[in-house]
Amino acid sequence: AASDVYKRQVVKWPDGWGVGVRPTRFERQPVAKAELPDDAVVKLIYFHQDQVIRLPEGAERVASSDFCDEAGFTLCTTDGVQTVLCLQGHPEFDAGYSTALLDSIESKVGTDRTKAARASLAKKTDSTLVAGWIKQFFTIAAQRRGWAA
C-alpha cells in the first residue's frame, strides 16, 4: 500500500477481509471540480485485508467507509503538488474479476463473507465516475508540473 511507504501506517485488519461492493463516503472532492453525488456516496468494489490506520504526514482524507475510516486520501509532494491519490476501493475491478478473486481465496475470506460479497457484486458501481476523477487528478498534477498531459 502507498501509505505503507510512510512509516508503517498500514495493518492487517483484525475483522478480516473487506470484499464486495461497498459505499464510500467522500468528505471532500478528491480533485478540483469533481462531481460528487448529492449524498457524496459512491459504490466501489472492495477487495482488501490491509487498512491504513493513520494517514501519512501531509495527507488529507477524502473518503471513509463503514469498513475503513481512511478509505481515500491525497498527498502533496514537497513542492506542494498533489501527486498521490489513494483509494481503498477498486474502480478498476469489475464483477467478473472480483468473483474470480473470491473463488481463489474463499478459504481466507470465509464462506459467509464470500457469499455476501458475491451477492453485492450484482449492484451497480460508480467505477466510471471515480475513474474520471483519477484521470482528472493526474492530468492536473501533470499540468502543475509542466508536463504534457
Name every feature range the model reports, one short phrase each.
Residues 13, 18-24:
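Long, hydrophobic, well-ordered secondary-structure blocks that form the structural core
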Residues 7-11:
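Post-Walker A helix-loop "phosphate-sensing" segment adjacent to the P-loop in P-loop NTPases
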Residues 1-6:
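Short, small-residue-biased leader/transition segments that mark boundaries at the very start
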Residues 26-149:
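Amide-donor transfer/coupling interface in amidating biosynthetic enzymes
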